[in-house]
C-alpha cells in the first residue's frame, strides 16, 4: 500500500487556515430578508393569546408567523413537534413567533414588541418526575401522533416516548452465581454541542416553485425529504446546498431552522430569507446533548468474572422526541460495554421533560452509559481487591461471545480490547501505581475506562459515489458526505487513490453538497462515512477500472484480463512499458487517422447496509449494525485535598482502528474527542431552575475548558481489520469522547475518596460529597 497509513493533509486545509473557505453564512445574497425567532420565556404553559399588531407596523417588517400559520407536526420518529409552538409551549426557548424583516436589527426589535399571555402549567423538571405515577403529561395525546417508524413504542398516558428491552440469558441464575455485587445510581446533565459555527439556514422559492435551501447541516438529504414531505412538494422541486460546515458534533443532524427559513420565505412570496441563531439561541432553542438518570447492578464471582447485570436508563429527551428513541436504543444495544456478560437485563427509555429536546451528540449516548458502567467496574475492582485493568482484561469480550442483542463476536466485527489495555498500561506507567501521594498536600491519580460503539443506522441506510475524469486524467470524487471537520473527504480520496494506484493530488474532491447533483448519502453521522461512502468509492473505482481496461484492450488489441492500472495508466501486466495514459482514454481513444473508439468514462458506486435487522421488542435480539469500534482510555489528574480542585495531567486513548488510513487525522479526531469528554466530565451542563428556566444560556454561564487547562494527550492504535469495511478501517470520529468521563470519574473517586455518581464533576460537587454540603471545611 502506498497511500493508506500516510498523514495526508486535509484537502480543504489551506482554504481553512487562510480564511478562504466559505461557510453558509459567508455567501452574500442580494435583496435578502432576515428572520428572527421570539422564544418562550416559560418551560410549560398554555398560550392564551399572541398580539402581533404593534410588531407588524414596525418599519421594515415584512411578515410575522405564529403557530397558527403552520399546522404541521414533524419529527424524526414521532411527529410531535410544531415548527412554531401552537396552543402551548413545552420548553424554555421554544419558538413562539417568527419575524421577517429587512434586517436582523429590525426583526429583533419587532419581536420584542409581540405580546404573549401565558397560563403556567406544572413543570416536569427531571426524568424521575416524568415517570412518577400521575405525572403531568407533556404530550397528552402521545399515541395519536403519526409515527415515522413502527418500531417506536410510546406508552399511552405516560411521558415515555419509547422503550427498548434487552433480555439475555438467565439473570436470576446469574445473581445466584454472583458472590460480589455492586450497584449505583447516576445522574447526567444535558449539555451543548458548542460548535464554532452556529446553526443557520437560508431559503428561497423560485418562480417555477423550486425551493432552494442553503444550510449548515449534517443531513442535507433529510432536509430535502422533510421539506418535500411535510409541505407536500415534489422532491425534484427541493434543492439543498451545504458547503463546509464549521463543526457539528451531531447537533446539525436535526432539521429545525431549515423549516423556519422555508416558512419565512413562503410568507414573503418566495424572497430569500436567512435565519441564523445567536449563540444564546443555539444553546437554548436548538437541540442539545441528552441527560440521563441511570441505575445499574453488577454481579461477579470471587475471581471477578461478571455473572449478571441489570440496568435501567431514563434518557432525558426533552420536550420533543426527535432522535431520543434512537439514543435509548443505542444504549441498549451496547449496554454491556466491551465485556462478556451472559446474563443481562436492560430497560432503556426515552422520556419527555420540559427541557430542551435532545439530538445526537458525539458518541451518540455512549459516553453517558460508559460513565455509569465504568464507575461500577472500578467499584467492583475495589470490592474484589483487584487491579482495575486486570478486571477489565478478565472480562473483555472475545471471539465466540455474544453482544447484548446476541450477535456473535468475531475479531473482525469487534477488535482486540486486551491489546488496547496492555498498551494503555505502558502509556500511563501503570506499574508505578494509580495513586501517588505528593509532598504539597496533593495527590496524583489515574482512572481508566473501556468503550465500544456500533452505529444506529436504518437497516437500509445507503451511500452513493460518482467518479468523473478531467481531460488530464485526474479524477473528481463526488459524494453526499458533508465535510464537518474530521477530514472525511480526504479519507475517501485516500481510499480512491489506493484503489486506483495513483497520486492523491490527482484526486479532486467536490466539497459542497447539492442534493440535485450529489449522490445520496444517508447522513454524515455515526462515524459511518468511511464505512459507507468508502465502500461506495471502492465499487465506483472498480467500475472505472473495468471501463478503462475495456477501452484500453481495444486500443492495445489484447484482452482486458491482461491489463492493470497504476500511475494514471493502463498497462500490460507482462510489459508495463506498454501502456495508454488515462488522459488518452477517458473521453474516448483516438487513432492516428482520427477514428475514435469508446467514450466518456465515469464510475458509479453504491452501498447499502445489508443483513441488519430490527430488534425484537421483548428480548432485543437482532443485528442493529455491522460492527464495533472498541478501545481503552485513561485520565491522570492532580487533586488538591484542601480545595477539592483538580487539574488534568494526561489523557490517553488506545483504539482498535482496524486499518489506520490517516494517522494524524485520526489522532486529531481522538484528541478533540478527549477534550470534549473532559469538558462534559468536569464542567459542561445545562442548569435549570425549579420552573424549568435554563440558567446557562451563554458562554459566560455555560462553562467550557480553556486552552491552558488541556493536559498532555496521547493516542495509540491497534489494528485488527474489519473484513466488511474498506481496507479494514473502522470508524473513529466519535470514539475519543466515550470513555473519558468514566475515566475521569474513576480518577476523582480515587483521589477524593468519594463515590462519583454525577456528571459533571465540579469542585462544588466533590465538596458536597465529602461534607454533605453542611460545612465549609472538613
Which residues does each PLM region occupy?
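Flexible, low-hydrophobicity surface segments
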Residues: 1-155, 269
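Glycine-rich loop/linker segments at domain edges
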Residues: 6, 12-15, 150, 154-201, ...
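Conserved catalytic cysteine-centered active-site region
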Residues: 86-89, 234-242, 267-278, 282
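Phosphate/diphosphate-binding loops
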Residues: 102, 270-317, 535-564, 568
Amino acid at each position: 500500500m502506498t497511500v493508506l497509513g500516510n498523514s495526508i493533509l486535509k484537502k480543504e486545509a489551506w482554504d481553512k487556515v487562510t480564511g478562504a473557505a466559505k461557510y453558509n453564512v459567508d455567501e452574500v445574497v442580494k435583496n435578502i430578508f432576515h428572520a428572527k425567532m421570539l422564544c418562550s420565556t416559560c418551560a410549560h404553559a398554555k398560550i392564551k393569546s399572541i398580539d402581533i399588531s404593534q410588531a407588524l407596523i414596525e418599519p421594515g417588517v415584512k411578515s410575522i408567523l405564529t403557530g397558527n400559520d403552520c399546522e404541521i407536526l414533524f419529527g424524526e420518529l414521532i411527529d410531535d413537534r410544531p415548527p412554531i409552538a401552537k396552543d402551548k409551549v413545552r420548553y424554555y426557548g421554544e419558538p413562539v413567533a417568527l419575524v421577517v424583516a429587512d434586517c436582523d436589527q429590525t426583526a429583533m426589535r419587532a419581536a420584542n414588541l409581540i405580546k404573549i399571555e401565558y397560563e403556567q402549567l406544572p413543570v416536569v423538571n427531571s426524568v424521575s418526575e416524568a415517570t412518577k405515577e400521575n405525572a403531568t403529561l407533556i404530550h397528552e395525546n402521545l399515541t395519536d401522533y403519526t409515527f415515522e417508524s413502527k418500531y417506536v413504542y410510546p406508552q399511552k398516558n405516560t411521558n415515555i416516548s419509547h422503550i427498548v428491552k434487552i433480555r439475555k440469558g438467565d439473570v436470576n441464575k446469574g445473581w445466584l452465581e454472583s458472590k460480589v455485587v455492586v450497584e449505583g445510581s447516576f445522574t447526567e446533565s444535558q449539555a451543548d454541542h458548542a460548535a464554532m459555527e452556529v446553526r443557520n439556514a437560508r431559503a428561497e422559492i423560485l418562480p417555477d416553485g423550486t425551493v432552494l435551501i442553503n444550510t449548515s447541516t449534517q443531513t442535507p438529504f433529510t432536509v430535502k425529504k422533510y421539506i418535500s414531505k411535510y409541505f407536500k412538494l415534489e422532491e425534484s422541486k427541493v434543492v439543498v446546498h451545504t458547503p463546509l460546515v464549521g463543526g457539528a458534533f451531531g447537533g446539525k443532524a436535526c432539521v429545525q431552522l431549515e423549516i423556519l427559513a422555508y416558512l419565512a420565505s413562503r410568507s414573503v412570496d418566495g424572497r430569500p430569507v436567512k435565519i441564523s441563531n445567536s449563540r444564546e439561541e443555539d444553546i437554548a432553542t436548538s437541540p442539545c446533548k441528552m441527560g440521563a438518570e441511570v441505575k445499574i447492578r453488577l454481579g461477579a464471582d470471587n475471581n471477578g468474572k461478571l455473572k449478571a447485570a441489570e440496568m435501567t436508563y431514563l434518557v432525558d429527551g426533552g420536550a420533543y422526541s426527535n432522535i431520543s428513541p434512537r439514543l435509548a436504543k443505542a444504549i441498549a444495544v451496547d449496554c454491556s460495554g466491551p465485556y462478556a456478560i451472559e446474563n443481562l437485563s436492560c430497560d432503556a427509555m426515552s422520556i419527555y421533560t420540559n427541557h430542551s429536546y435532545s439530538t445526537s451528540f458525539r458518541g451518540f449516548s455512549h459516553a453517558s452509559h460508559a460513565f455509569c458502567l465504568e464507575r461500577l467496574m472500578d467499584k467492583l475492582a475495589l470490592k474484589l481487591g483487584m487491579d482495575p485493568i486486570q478486571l477489565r482484561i478478565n472480562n473483555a469480550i472475545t471471539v465466540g461471545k455474544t453482544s447484548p442483542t446476541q450477535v456473535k463476536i468475531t475479531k473482525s466485527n469487534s477488535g482486540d480490547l486486551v491489546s488496547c489495555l496492555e498498551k494503555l498500561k505502558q502509556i500511563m506507567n501503570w506499574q508505578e501505581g494509580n495513586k501517588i501521594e505528593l509532598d504539597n498536600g496533593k495527590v496524583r491519580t489515574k482512572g481508566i475506562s473501556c468503550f465500544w460503539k456500533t452505529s444506529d443506522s436504518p437497516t437500509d441506510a445507503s451511500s452513493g459515489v460518482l467518479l468523473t475524469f478531467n481531460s488530464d486524467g485526474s479524477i473528481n470524487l463526488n459524494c453526499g458526505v458533508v465535510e464537518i471537520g474530521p477530514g472525511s473527504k480526504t479519507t475517501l480520496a485516500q481510499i480512491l487513490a489506493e484503489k486506483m494506484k495513483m497520486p492523491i493530488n490527482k484526486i479532486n474532491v467536490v466539497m459542497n453538497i447539492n442534493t440535485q447533483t450529489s449522490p445520496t448519502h444517508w447522513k454524515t453521522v455515526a462515524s459511518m462515512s468511511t464505512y459507507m461512502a468508502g465502500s461506495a468509492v471502492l465499487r465506483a473505482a472498480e467500475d472505472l477500472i473495468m471501463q478503462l481496461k475495456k477501452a484500453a484492450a481495444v486500443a492495445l488489441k489484447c484482452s482486458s484480463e491482461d491489463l492493470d492500472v497504476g500511475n494514471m495508466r493502463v498497462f500490460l501486466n507482462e510489459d508495463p512499458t506498454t501502456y495508454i495514459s488515462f488522459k488518452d482514454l477517458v473521453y474516448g481513444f483516438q487513432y492516428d487517422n482520427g477514428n475514435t473508439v469508446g467514450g466518456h468514462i465515469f464510475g458509479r458506486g453504491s452501498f447499502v447496509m445489508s443483513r441488519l435487522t430490527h430488534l425484537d421488542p421483548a428480548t432485543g435480539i437482532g443485528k442493529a449494525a455491522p460492527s464495533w469500534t472498541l478501545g481503552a482510555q485513561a485520565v491522570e489528574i492532580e487533586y488538591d485535598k484542601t480545595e477539592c480542585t483538580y487539574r488534568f495531567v494526561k489523557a490517553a486513548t488506545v483504539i482498535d482502528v482496524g486499518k489506520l488510513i490517516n494517522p494524524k487525522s485520526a489522532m486529531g479526531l481522538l484528541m478533540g474527542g478527549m477534550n470534549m469528554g473532559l469538558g462534559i466530565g468536569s464542567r459542561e451542563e445545562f442548569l435549570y431552575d425549579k420552573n424549568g428556566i435554563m440558567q446557562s444560556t451563554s458562554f459566560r454561564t455555560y462553562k467550557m475548558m480553556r486552552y491552558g487547562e488541556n493536559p498532555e494527550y496521547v493516542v495509540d492504535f491497534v489494528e485488527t481489520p474489519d473484513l466488511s469495511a474498506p481496507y479494514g478501517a473502522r470508524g473513529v470520529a466519535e470514539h475519543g469522547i466515550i470513555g473519558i468521563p468514566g475515566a475521569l470519574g474513576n480518577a476523582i473517586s480515587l483521589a477524593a475518596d468519594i463515590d462519583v455518581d454525577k456528571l459533571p464533576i465540579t469542585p462544588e460537587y466533590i465538596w458536597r460529597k465529602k461534607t454533605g454540603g453542611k460545612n465549609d471545611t472538613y
